[in-house]
């Protein structure tokens, strides 16, 4: 793998850090447990660390890679014939069209580029109905945010939306020295499985997303100030929410209650949440 890296200059703008530890690669492939006939999608195959061993198991693998140089690099390997290649940004790929073509739930995995990992997660959450599971290598800090509880430093909008949509498990942490070039931060391998039915009820997830975004834009402000234009102190108290609390102190259930109150009482009825 180190020899491969020397042949390809990693691009900072694409957050290219390649996993080189073969034991970890085997561990990841074993956990993903790819099967024949599944719709498997790899985000950013890179130098083929996961691509090759997975292609040894399956007959077809869909890969999305924005760097044409990397795709040209992979062409020299025999497993390339098993790949269905899309040279484009994973954020704008048409996953819904893929689902309709294959008529199967999609399994997505990969070492997500650091600079767009959060954006990609939100993108996939919105498509939860067509996804079977997701297995990603993420920045450790992002992984901690995914599973964070109210009242903790890591808890935020990502925690709320992620837990609304998915059951999330931290599988293992990966030290930075297992990548080339060596990043400044450690990583974590995470498994996300969309809920068949969310444990949290909201009339409209877009409203929940809106108010959590509003609340956490200035997370140190108390709710009376961050959400005061929507909820009066009287309404907060009616919903058993202390207006003196900060955004990080409210549970997912409480945010759902706030979003449902907006819908049920036609608050912000002229607001476009798209």
Curated annotation (Swiss-Prot):
SUPFAM superfamilies given in the database record: S-adenosyl-L-methionine-dependent methyltransferases
Location of this chain's protein in the cell: Cytoplasm
Principal place of residence: cytoplasm
Pfam families to which the protein is assigned, alphabetical: RrnaAD
EC number(s) from the headed UniProt entry: 2.1.1.182
Reaction equations catalysed: adenosine(1518)/adenosine(1519) in 16S rRNA + 4 S-adenosyl-L-methionine = N(6)-dimethyladenosine(1518)/N(6)-dimethyladenosine(1519) in 16S rRNA + 4 S-adenosyl-L-homocysteine + 4 H(+)
Gene Ontology cellular component annotations, sorted alphabetically: cytosol
InterPro entries tied to this protein: KsgA/Erm, rRNA_Ade_diMease-like_C, rRNA_Ade_Mease_Trfase_CS, rRNA_Ade_methylase_Trfase_N, rRNA_adenine_dimethylase, SAM-dependent_MTases_sf
Keywords from the UniProt entry: Cytoplasm, Methyltransferase, RNA-binding, rRNA processing, S-adenosyl-L-methionine, Transferase
GO MF annotation, one: RNA binding
Role: Specifically dimethylates two adjacent adenosines (A1518 and A1519) in the loop of a conserved hairpin near the 3'-end of 16S rRNA in the 30S particle. May play a critical role in biogenesis of 30S subunits.
HAMAP family per the UniProt record, alphabetical: 16SrRNA_methyltr_A (MF_00607)
Name the record gives this protein: Ribosomal RNA small subunit methyltransferase A
Source species of the chain: Buchnera aphidicola subsp. Schizaphis graminum (strain Sg)
């Amino acid at each position: 793998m180190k020899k491969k890296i020397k042949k390809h200059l990693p691009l900072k703008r694409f957050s290219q850090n390649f996993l080189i530890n073969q034991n970890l690669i085997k561990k990841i492939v074993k956990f993903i447990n790819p099967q024949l006939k599944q719709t498997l999608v790899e985000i950013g195959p890179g130098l083929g660390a996961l691509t090759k061993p997975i292609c040894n198991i399956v007959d077809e693998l869909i890969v999305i890679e924005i760097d044409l140089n990397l795709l040209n690099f992979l062409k020299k390997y025999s497993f390339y014939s098993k790949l269905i290649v899309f040279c484009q940004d994973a954020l704008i790929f048409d996953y819904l069209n893929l689902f309709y073509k294959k008529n199967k739930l999609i399994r997505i995995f990969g070492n997500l580029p650091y600079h767009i990992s959060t954006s990609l997660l939100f993108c996939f959450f919105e498509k939860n109905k067509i996804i079977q599971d997701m297995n990603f290598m993420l920045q450790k800090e992002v992984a901690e945010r995914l599973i964070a509880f109210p009242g903790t430093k890591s808890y935020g909008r990502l925690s709320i939306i992620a837990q609304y949509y998915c059951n999330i498990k931290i599988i293992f942490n990966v030290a930075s020295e297992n990548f080339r070039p060596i990043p400044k931060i450690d990583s974590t391998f995470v498994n996300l499985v969309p809920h068949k039915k969310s444990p949290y009820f909201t009339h409209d997830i877009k409203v929940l997303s809106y108010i959590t975004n509003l609340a956490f834009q200035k997370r140190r402000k108390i709710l009376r100030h961050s959400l005061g234009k929507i909820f009066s102190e009287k309404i907060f108290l009616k919903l058993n929410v202390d207006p003196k609390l900060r955004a990080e102190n409210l549970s997912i259930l409480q945010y759902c209650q706030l979003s449902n109150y907006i819908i049920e009482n036609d608050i912000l009825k002229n607001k476009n949440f798209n």
